């Protein structure tokens, strides 16, 4: 009986650890899975890393993660 309780306790500890990893990963999702500077972002415009935003040309194509210009940094 004691062995079964020990196994249950270990199993529950593992579940708690895995859930905390999943929650932490979701909270840090932008930092872990962001699109870097000068990379294509047309399919996910809100996924650029911090300090960057998705800029496209006049026709809405060739979208890339870029930093804000001088005027954009002041605003």
Swiss-Prot record:
Belongs to the xibalbin-13 family. Expressed by the venom gland and the whole body. Probable neurotoxin. Strongly inhibits voltage-gated potassium channels (Kv1.1/KCNA1, Kv1.2/KCNA2, Kv1.3/KCNA3, and Kv1.6/KCNA6, with the highest toxicity against Kv1.1 (85.1% inhibition at 1 uM)) and mildly inhibits sodium channels (Nav1.2/SCN2A, Nav1.4/SCN4A, Nav1.5/SCN5A, Nav1.6/SCN8A, and BgNav). Induces activation of protein kinase A type II (PKA-II) and MAP kinase Erk1/2 in primary nociceptive and non-nociceptive sensory neurons. Does not show cytotoxic activity. Does not have an impact on Ca2+, cAMP, and NO signaling in the cell types analyzed. Keywords: Disulfide bond, Ion channel impairing toxin, Neurotoxin, Potassium channel impairing toxin, Secreted, Signal, Toxin, Voltage-gated potassium channel impairing toxin, Voltage-gated sodium channel impairing toxin. This is Xibalbin-13 2. The presence of a 'disulfide through disulfide knot' structurally defines this protein as a knottin. Residues 28-30 form a propeptide. It is found in: Secreted. Disulfide bonds join 34-49, 41-54, 48-65, 56-63.
């Amino acid at each position: 009986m004691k062995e079964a309780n020990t196994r249950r306790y270990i199993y529950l500890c593992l579940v708690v650890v895995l859930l905390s990893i999943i929650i932490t990963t979701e909270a840090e999702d932008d930092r872990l899975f962001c699109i870097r500077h000068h990379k294509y972002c047309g399919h996910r415009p809100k996924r650029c890393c911090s300090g960057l935003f998705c800029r496209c040309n006049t026709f809405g194509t060739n979208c890339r993660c870029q930093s804000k210009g001088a005027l954009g940094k002041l605003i």
